[in-house]
């Protein structure tokens, strides 16, 4: 695990950030937390469409699990009322447990899938659950030859995507 974390830190240090892509929330089924599975064209040469969609669908599944109301959620609510919410000083809620599972999954995906392709997935919790942010990195040694071709295309996409993520 230490070498995998080292690789993510190495990616941030040795590569320059080219652009960011934002995957927006999908409100087609109401306000439940889910993200669009539409493949962004900026990632076309970086990651296979199937891997991207599988990752987003897995995240959507985790968020559905977190928001699912079951017996344990009902019991948590009853205990919270009975203890004036002091119970949450001693235990994690079901939602918090699933959010930790999501963070571990994102870390694992970054190490195994995204970082080797020069990409970095940001936990949606860090962006207020509004977007999934994917940072696209370029090698500093190869950025001189490819920066002129990618700067015109990525400049317009990062300007549009940056506005959506900054709101």
Swiss-Prot record:
Report the PTM annotation. Answer: Palmitoylated by ZDHHC5. Palmitoylation is required for the maintenance of ZDHHC5 at the plasma membrane.
Q: Which UniProt keywords apply?
A: Cell membrane, Golgi apparatus, Lipoprotein, Membrane, Palmitate
Ranges for region Disordered: 140-167
Q: How is this protein annotated for GO cellular component? A: Golgi membrane; plasma membrane
Cell compartments where the protein resides: Cell membrane; Golgi apparatus membrane
- Answer whether the UniProt record assigns the keyword Translocase to this protein: no
The annotated regions of Gly residues compositional bias extend over 158-167
Lipidated positions (S-palmitoyl cysteine) are 78, 81
- Tell me what topology the record assigns in the membrane: Lipid-anchor
Major site of localization recorded for this protein:
membrane
The terms under GO molecular function for this entry are: enzyme binding
Q: Where is the composition biased (Low complexity)?
A: 142-157
Family to which the UniProt record says this protein belongs: Belongs to the ERF4 family.
Q: Which PANTHER family match?
A: GOLGI AUTOANTIGEN, GOLGIN SUBFAMILY A, 7, GOLGIN SUBFAMILY A MEMBER 7B
What does this chain do?
A: Play a role in cell adhesion by regulating the plasma membrane localization of the palmitoyltransferase ZDHHC5. May be involved in protein transport from Golgi to cell surface.
What's the protein called, per UniProt?
Golgin subfamily A member 7B
Gene name?
A: GOLGA7B
